[in-house]
Amino acid sequence: MYCPFCNAEDTKVIDSRLVEEGTQVRRRRECLKCQERFTTFETAELNLPRIIKRDGRRSAFDEEKLRAGLLKALEKRPISTEQIETAVQRIIHKLRARGECEVSSQWLGELVMDELRALDEVAYVRFASVYRSFQDINAFRDEIRRLQKQQKKSHDK
């Protein structure tokens, strides 16, 4: 690592500590040339797949956009911030676990709907209405029927 004071290449680590709940390493370093000390922080770079949009464009995964979509669907619903954050982390974990460089926005949308279905059925229908572009009340009715059939199947098991 280069010294930020004299640009020398040789530095030594004096102290290392885990910070940010173990997700980051704080290192205290000393330049071997000018003896100045400085601090560096290291975090693992965990690449998430790029998202392939319906029109074929590709964009970086945006965690804030995911969170905003969940928050919008769950607005005025009895779901805690912790539950929302857990859902966000589950979705991110599934994205990473898939192990691909790119995933379709449709696949990601289905993941979001699965999480919402488990959290709150009203939020699920809200999100589905936008995601699937419901045009009329019949589309809502069909989605609610599909949801009820899934519930019945899971209760019968």
From Swiss-Prot:
Signal peptide span: none
Cofactor field: Zn(2+)
InterPro entries: ATP-cone_dom, NrdR-like_N, RNR_NrdR-like
GO biological process terms, semicolon-separated: negative regulation of DNA-templated transcription
The entry's keywords: ATP-binding, DNA-binding, Metal-binding, Nucleotide-binding, Repressor, Transcription, Transcription regulation, Zinc, Zinc-finger
Free-text comment on the cofactor: Binds 1 zinc ion.
Domain ATP-cone positions: 49-139
Keyword ATP-binding: yes
Described purpose of this protein according to its UniProt entry: Negatively regulates transcription of bacterial ribonucleotide reductase nrd genes and operons by binding to NrdR-boxes.
Family per record: Belongs to the NrdR family.
Protein's UniProt name: Transcriptional repressor NrdR
Organism in which the protein naturally occurs: Coxiella burnetii (strain RSA 493 / Nine Mile phase I)
